[in-house]
Amino acid sequence: YSHLWDVFTPIKNKKDSEEIEVFLADVDVREKFYNTLCSYGRAFTMVMNSVQAFAAFERQEIEMFRDTLIFFTKIRKSVKIRYADTLDNSEYEPQMRNLLDTYMSVKDVIQIYEPIDIMKIGDFDKVLEKLPSDRSKADAIVSHITKRITLNHDENPAFYDSFSQRINAALEEFKNKVLSEREFLKKMFGVLKDFRKGNTKQKFPEKIAGDLDAQAFYGVIASILFAKYKIE
């Protein structure tokens, strides 16, 4: 129990789930949190399944341990979406899953068992609706687009670089408080919409205006030539 809360020592308001999620933006901290939560869940499972261990705690303590498990399981589900981590329930042993089913309804936790595809409008948008704040939704869009850019960048560098630049510009504006959380989210929805449609501000020759494969080839060649001859 104490080890789990120790992960969040720097946080002032430990009841603020948004502050906790922002703190978990660091991948190393997030990984530590996931591992510590799994250990805590297993320990709680042992207590609930042992008459002697159960008897060693007051009822209020058991309820506190249970509520902590529920609270951080919700956080875990949310940040895995927010930061585009691989969603995998394999670390939850059958006993752990049964325990969660006992104390948490389906509505309590975002249930996701398949990888999230941001190109599927209905699926991803439903997931976003479950996130608690405008910033968490915007962060999720940024993380998932960035992940896709990283995986596919070599296929069309110019195309993906254009979206990286738009995302970085929006992040900088948000960081400098030029954009509010709502404005940041609105801008990210615009980026997501263009990303899905393949719309960029990049100009192509008229003959390949409707040919995405030709545009990808053109983008690769153009980026090489622009870099070689230092063309702006």
Regions picked out by a protein language model, each given a short descriptive name:
Residues Y1-E232:
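Catalytic cores and motor modules of nucleic-acid processing enzymes
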